[in-house]
């Protein structure tokens, strides 16, 4: 913290100033976030790898504190606004339409859309993340097998930081003319209760098919 001239301020004012400064992102965190945002938008990296790569690119120590996701999200939105404003809205719409296709296919498992496609920061390089809430955690996998859908099982980090089984499939977007990764994260039905708690910014962190349709209705068509 910089030692600015603070003589004559009362103790309550000093305390308020310290808290205000601590809450503000420092210049280094902002620099890392801005570098990470470019990797997220231009290369489709997830935020964690993008932050670590930004640290390396900037020549910082590997253990440098990383910016929080809110700061990275702000940087991503700013980058999109500056460099992708003409293309990103149509790409986002195409991804949400593809997400809805898979949500309808997997409707019995209460699918919810999360991540960049839900929050509106996705581009054509972004994958789609759907959370399924199942009575039987194997039932979603069985459904894919029954419908002859090729998938790749993997383990990912869930929204509580725990390990979660994911079924990754390839979804074809006619609007984008590309194949998009669609990741089906399998949760217990009981997890649905806490899945809709507001995030740090007071937003609902994921939405069901009805919510996705509402987003599409609110967007201008490409």
Residue ranges and their predicted role:
Residues 18-24:
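A ubiquitous short alpha-helical element
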Residues 11-14:
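Leucine-biased recognition of intrinsically disordered, low-complexity hydrophobic segments
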């Amino acid at each position: 913290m910089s030692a600015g001239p603070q003589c004559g301020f009362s103790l309550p004012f000093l305390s308020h100033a310290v808290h205000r400064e601590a809450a503000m992102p420092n210049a280094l965190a902002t620099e890392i976030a801005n570098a990470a945002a470019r990797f997220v938008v231009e290369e489709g990296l997830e935020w964690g790898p993008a932050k670590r790569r930004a640290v390396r690119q900037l020549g910082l120590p590997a253990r440098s504190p990383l910016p929080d996701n809110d700061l990275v999200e702000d940087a991503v939105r700013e980058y999109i606004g500056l460099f992708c404003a003409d293309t990103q809205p149509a790409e986002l719409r195409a991804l949400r339409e593809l997400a809805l296709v898979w949500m309808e296919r997997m409707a019995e498992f209460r699918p919810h859309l999360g991540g960049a496609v839900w929050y509106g920061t996705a581009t054509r390089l972004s994958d789609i993340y759907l959370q399924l809430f199942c009575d039987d955690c194997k039932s979603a996998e069985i459904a894919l097998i029954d419908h002859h859908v090729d998938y790749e099982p993997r383990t990912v980090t869930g929204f509580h930081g725990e390990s979660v089984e994911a079924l990754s499939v390839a979804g074809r977007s006619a609007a984008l003319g590309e194949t998009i990764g669609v990741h089906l994260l399998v949760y217990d039905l009981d997890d649905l209760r806490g899945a809709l708690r507001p995030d740090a910014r007071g937003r609902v962190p994921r939405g069901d098919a009805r919510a996705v349709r509402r987003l599409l209705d609110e967007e201008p068509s490409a």
